[in-house]
Amino acid sequence: HAPAFWRWLDRAAGGRAEKRDVILAALFMVLANRYDWQLFLEVTGPGGSGKSIMAEIATLLAGEDNATSATIETLESPRERAALTGFSLIRLPDQEKWSGDGAGLKAITGGDAVSVDPKYRDAYSTHIPAVILAVNNNPMRFTDRSGGVSRRRVIIHFPEQIAPQERDPQLKDKITRELAVIVRHLMQKFSNPMLARSLLQSQQNSDEALNIKRDADPTFDFIGYLETLPQTSGMYMGNASIIPRNYRKYLYHAYLAYMEANGYRNVLSLKMFGLGLPVMLKEYGLNYEKRHTKQGIQTNLTLKEESYGDWLPKCDDPATA
């Protein structure tokens, strides 16, 4: 009944039924304005993969008058936030290579009151009850390590770049004409709205989302090379002043070796690394345990086998002795 929409959806989902359901759940969240789920949507993928059509459909579902475009800087600034009040959908198109802690984004999606400072009027505090949809070629890089952003972030990746000759310039108009059918389908499919919510939550820690985050955040990628042991008999935390470096014994040394091997300069301090570790491990479904010993903090973590081939210095390196 909505051939253009289904064709777009099938390509965006790579023909996978479970991915189709996640995209539909995201559209339902916009339609029903479920800002109270405290999630924000981030659609990533190469140019021409159908991301902008996703934003167009979301705008149609929210209603053109209820949607606005902004940048992530708008969300972070009390002066600029004034422009966002009164909308139920906030689109963030192409936040190219943005990096920051996302405090405003976290507060708005978390349902916290944020300060708004309009020109020529007194500042005040308010809630912004809107669903946020970011559309990016490259995923945003959040420096927040508390888990406040990752707990709310739903990444949906559109991997396939549609060849220019296959693109339909009339696609948006065709889908606009199918809107009534799309709305009816979403309302029927998610007559229990919690089904949509649980689909989005399961997407948060899906392999797809983890891989996108690994590509965007080197520290998060390093955590993917760790596995847990049944007891705290694994690597010690270590610190930067222990010489010579022992990459197999000390976790922090292994992290520094990973960053160096991959040419990353902005390493986390030991303190920030230690604070972020349990939160990032949790995203991989792993539990962090540690104990204090005479040799320092010992953890339940060890390096996976693939670390040795991918980036760990070889044994004949004198620094590993």
Q: What residue spans do the PLM features occupy?
A:
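Hydrophobic (often cysteine-bearing) scaffold residues that line and stabilize catalytic clefts
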Residues: 19-23, 51-54, 101, 179, ...
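Conserved two-lobed SF2 helicase motor
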Residues: 88-91, 132-136
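Phosphate-handling catalytic cores of nucleic-acid transaction enzymes
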Residues: 59, 67-68, 176-221
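Short coil/turn segments at secondary-structure boundaries
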Residues: 21-25, 39-42, 118-121, 186, ...
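Alpha-helical scaffold elements adjacent to nucleotide-binding pockets in ATP/GTP-utilizing enzyme cores
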Residues: 54-57, 83, 87, 101-108, ...
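P-loop NTPase catalytic core of nucleic-acid-dependent motor ATPases
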Residues: 1-86, 154-157, 186, 195, ...
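Positively charged interface segments
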Residues: 62-77, 99-102, 118-123, 129-130, ...
